[in-house]
Amino acid sequence: MDVAEFQQWVNDYYDNRGWSELDIFIRIGFLAEETGEVARAIRALEIGRDRPDEATESFEENRQELVEELGDVLGNVMVIANKYNISLEEVFHSHKRKLSERYSEE
């Protein structure tokens, strides 16, 4: 599945559940929440959680958690992009161009 197909799948999936209709500021809150969960997953991978009320997970379990949380972030980014009719391909090209212009080698 390429990026455009995945973006369309996310759009359809969220639409079918009515999740795309949420106010954009609620969606931004979800994105912030998921970003925090990415930070927590990275902490578990890098330094551990060291909490007596949580079981210690293996590296692979922690890595899989990070994969899932990155997916949640990406899903929220796609919903926001879809709301404003922005393809991820457009985002990729724009970001690449911005970085290339800003940090071009002389």
Regions inferred by a protein language model and the residue ranges of each:
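Flexible "arm" and connector segments at domain edges
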Residues: M1-L70, L74-E106
